[in-house]
Amino acid sequence: MKILKKKKKGNQQIVPDERYRELDSHAPNENEIADEAPMSRKILYYLKLVYHEIRENITIYLLIILYLCVCVMNKIMAKRTLKKIGNYSFVTSETHNTICMVVFFSLYFIFGRRVTSAKERHQNFGLQFLLISLLDACSVIIAFIGLTRTTGNIQSFVMQLSIPINMFFCFLILRYRYHLFNYVGASIIVLTIAIVEFILSFETQEENSIVFNLVLIASLIPMSFSNMTREIVFKKYKINILRLNAVVSFFQIFTSCLMLPMYTLPFLKQINLPFSEIGTNIKNGFRCLILGQNTIVENCGLGMAKMCDDCEGAWKTFLAYSFFNICDNLITSFIIDKFSTMTYTIVSCIQGPAIAIAYYFKFLAGDAVMKPRVLDFVTLFGYLFGSIIYRVGNIILEKKKMMEAGNDDDSEGELTNAESIITQ
């Protein structure tokens, strides 16, 4: 008698991940750990877990170190470029986007097309690329306004708020699920930065406005959606990283034009530019960048209406910035592609304390070198500790997901055996 008849899927078995099988082999019986075991044995046990985690994820840790080095150099070279040709932001932005487009398209046609499937090659992702470009442009424009009345310490804290903002939108849209340790780790990072920057804020007398602080925080929302769109494109369509960055750079050449009206806003201080002077500013910008000719040399400087030009050798500094920025974009895309938006968000937050420490070294910071501060190392420790807690939450979730998959497979096997008995 046939009561149930279900199409058999074969003897598919989910093989437990060898990483966690080996991890379990390191773990003694829970009661044995909880009992009065010698302290040395407990320490050895946890050291084995740390060794196992590093060994199995050595690639991502090396990638984090590489990203950190590139990101620090990117920010330092960006500051040097701003110091030399800060009066010509539109020229540097458009020139940089053009360089990125040429480099990414060249790399894609040389290397990317060989590994690109025919389906991807003929599929049009123009809408997704345009959306990413518009979100990036929107984020830059909003941040551009917010930064004008936001002090450096508050800027650093606001950047860390990308963690809870990304967690919220990834939970809402990408259906991410988090462990308690994820929330604890993220909170440790944000609170550490908040406390340190609050202390440092008393050392500065810079102009600050709560309204502009909120505007800067708002710029994190389109940035979060941009990163999530990248993740969807990578995971769903398996698109080539070089292709995405090439086309996005192409669109950004046009979306950067949206920035032009922003320069006429009166509260932009040194970078304020009357509409009638935009054409002259663009011409002088190219003269500064390509020919090294200074235009603004009088009635300029710290506290004045304009920054002074320092165009000699500006093209070298600018090319160095473009190189590290291109590397930054590639590594960012790779992290989002291979891991997730939240992994990138957590990793990117280390750049704050790392950049502060990098300014201790004159060969990196140049004239902007700073004296070491204990608070910078406190920030770095808080970030590392919070990241470890966050990673523990990910490990627990991954292992739980594998166990649930194994249980589902066992249940399906029992049902199949029952069906075979009933139908005999």
UniProtKB/Swiss-Prot annotation:
Sequence ranges on the Cytoplasmic membrane side: 1-57, 111-124, 175-179, 230-246, 338-345, 398-424
Entry keywords, A to Z: Amino-acid transport, Disulfide bond, Glycoprotein, Membrane, Transmembrane, Transmembrane helix, Transport, Vacuole
Superkingdom: Eukaryota
Disulfide bonds: 288-311, 300-308
A GO term for molecular function: xenobiotic transmembrane transporter activity
Principal location listed in the UniProt entry: membrane
Record bears the keyword Transmembrane: yes
Topology of the protein relative to the lipid bilayer: Multi-pass membrane protein
Transmembrane parts of this sequence: 58-78, 90-110, 125-145, 154-174, 180-200, 209-229, 247-267, 317-337, 346-366, 377-397
GO term, biological process aspect, one: amino acid transport
Vacuolar topological segments: 79-89, 146-153, 201-208, 268-316, 367-376
Entry-linked InterPro entries: CRT-like, Transprt_Chloroquine
UniProt keyword Transport present: yes
Glycosylated residues in this chain: 87
UniProt-annotated location(s): Vacuole membrane
GO cellular component terms, semicolon-separated: vacuolar membrane
Protein function: Nutrient transporter. Involved in maintaining the osmotic homeostasis of the digestive vacuole.
Family: Belongs to the CRT-like transporter family.
PANTHER family the record matches: PROTEIN CLT2, CHLOROPLASTIC
Protein name per UniProt: Putative chloroquine resistance transporter
Protein's organism: Plasmodium knowlesi
Taxon lineage: Eukaryota, Sar, Alveolata, Apicomplexa, Aconoidasida
